[in-house]
């Protein structure tokens, strides 16, 4: 969904599953909704705000570059096939396969019936089903993977392909990762943690992961790292015996940051944390301070400036 120019930590679990599938011999293809992104997946309560075509195109190019660099996946844009479909062809070739009662029975649609849902959002399901059909026919895609909130859209695609071609295809969903309170995992103080290091520094990622809840860290090691079962069990033992050392937390931060940005960025984040928490401020460069606190939070003052002047 190209609503931003970078992926965030909330996306990471599904991408890592696709990475595991790739290592097992499969060929993952990331679909970016350059077409559907201009409409928006129905939300449980309100309609999503539209974003401009120019912004969608910019976001697509940024996401494509990021995914190719980090994960090595092929990236496609569904606007490439939607731009050639007119409304008559859409209704004749695809709409006829969708029963309105079937669509109304989808959970996300049912929850919006009382408050109202536009036809734009209502038709989103058909477009996602069409995506699966196109990729199946043109790219040989037989399995669609997504978060569990996309189950209804995936099954719509499976049904469309079966009805129109007789082919059997499959869906694979994964639960959304949450913290111990059931809140979506991957935000710090309400803000997204971006995978683009110019938007979220490696230091901020490090601080986030070394401070995850003790009760959840082993589960996160299983989801977000490629450590072996035996290695994770060893970290679990260490965490139980000496939780104050936070070895499992540090391993989580190390594995994720090294995977995303490389060993050098991880070591830099550890070094910055050491300087900050051991009061070694004199050794920090201006760029180090900007990474620690964000350049927008840094102000230059003169030696004789008072607090009143600053305020």
Where are these regions (language model features)?
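NTP-dependent nucleotidyl-transfer catalytic core
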Residues: 1-150, 154-158, 164-170, 183
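Conserved nucleotide- and phosphate/pyrophosphate-binding catalytic cores
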Residues: 163-311
